[in-house]
């Protein structure tokens, strides 16, 4: 009887502990994230088999030189250079690359270039965003925003 009781306790511990372990490893990137510099908020969510990221807020939405909304004026493509930054899609082809990790490309509106990118959730409120040119990479940490 003692063996059976011990077996049941061990089984229950394993079964009840599994969801907690999965929650730790299954961190989701979905939500609104404040960039490291605090200048923009990006809504990250699932799309297709990967994730998408769209600018939803700017600290300074008005361009002081024009008095109008900030636009993608660093983009080399004249057709894209007039689109507003708010609503701009930053991620492309972001696909799962491991637990809590996605790889694809990221657009940088500050210089108008697209870079190879890796994104990883390192905690419930921490998103690491990395952009690379060849072997040179830079990264920043975004924090989850309430809105």
Where are the model-predicted features located?
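Positively charged n-region of N-terminal signal peptides that target proteins for export
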Residues: 1-5
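Bacterial N-terminal signal peptides
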Residues: 6-17
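Sec/Tat signal peptide C-region and signal peptidase I cleavage site
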Residues: 18-23
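Central antiparallel beta-sheet cores of small beta-barrel/beta-sandwich binding domains
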Residues: 29-30, 36-107, 114-115
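Short aromatic-glycine motifs in intrinsically disordered, low-complexity regions
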Residues: 78-79, 127-134
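Acidic, glycine-rich flexible loop segments
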Residues: 104-129
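Edge beta-strand at a domain terminus
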Residues: 124, 133-147
